[in-house]
Amino acid sequence: MDIFKELILKHPDENVLISPVSILSTLSILNHGAAGSTAEQLSKYIENVNENTPDDKKDDNNDMDVDIPYCATLATANKIYCSDSIEFHASFLQKIKDGFQTVNFNNANQTKELINEWVKTMTNGKINSLLTSPLSINTRMTVVSAVHFKAMWKYPFSKHLTYTDKFYISKNIVTSVDMMVSTENDLQYVHINELFGGFSIIDIPYEGNSSMVIILPDDIEGIYNIEKNITDEKFKKWCGMLSTKSIDLYMPKFKVEMTEPYNLVPILENLGLTNIFGYYADFSKMCNETITVEKFLHTTFIDVNEEYTEASAVTGVFMTNFSMVYRTKVYINHPFMYMIKDNTGRILFIGKYCYPQ
């Protein structure tokens, strides 16, 4: 949640989407090779994240793969591209298993295309590239984590009911969206009044064991108050208040595609991970060379339609030297927050939708 909150501060009027699973996986890979204060900071951050993660989903930092057996439609993959001149310690190579490939970073364009092709393959063609420009010839290692999620709705929206409706970007700005309709479904729902405003939470299930949770403020511009006040603890508390209600749901079709990846370096530094960058970086359990994290890139994609949701994310580290008597109607027609989670509560993707593309 913390990285997401930092990002929405930097992009207040934009659609934001990240995959905590992908980011944590990449940080865990780095922790395999970290020592000293670098290892202390990474371990502390991962431990703090794990405090808000179900016990059977915690990253124990002993496996490079993020295994989520309850969500068969989620595929994760990790890859390390390193200079063919670096000799890695056997203990590090043993921990990262097979996700390892040597490349010649002097051939920057070829290496860029190699990495982008892997990203495209691992995300089922939904993210065509992580790198938009060639890597520096000084790059010594690149750590890439890809996540691809696709799930059919348990209660599909009827295509013939989809219609054009208004979406309020703000009180003064209105646009049009394709509004999907699903009626008379028993869904988990709650309306909550907090000091900062009222909002609704609705849990929309997929086939299998995952769901999308929507947090919809009562006020058209109420998303900003939710952004400021939401925490992992509050989100868990709110979800614990959900109960089954018969719902008529009106929800926009939406797609979010990023034109440029997020560079998470300043955000990670703000969150206390200062010693994975620059002079104080210590990755001596990885190799004997003095290497540091130069870039930490994260890019995402999501497509929500009548039949399914498909989402992907890629994180790259570049190292250089949501039976009643009545039905509740929920109209999602202004900015909202959403999460895709598995049935243990682990958040796979978290986003804010405020501007139809």
UniProtKB/Swiss-Prot annotation:
Transmembrane segments: none annotated. Gene3D superfamilies: Alpha-1-antitrypsin, domain 1, Antithrombin, subunit I, domain 2. GO terms for molecular function: serine-type endopeptidase inhibitor activity. GO terms for cellular component: extracellular space; host cell cytoplasm. It holds the Pfam family Serpin. The record marks F322, S323 as: Reactive bond. It is found in: Host cytoplasm. Keywords: Host cytoplasm, Protease inhibitor, Serine protease inhibitor. SMART domains: SERPIN (SM00093). PANTHER family: GH10112P-RELATED, SERINE PROTEASE INHIBITOR, SERPIN. This viral protein may be involved in the regulation of the complement cascade. Involved in red pock formation. Belongs to the serpin family. Poxviruses subfamily. This is Serine proteinase inhibitor 1. It comes from Rabbitpox virus (strain Utrecht) (RPV).
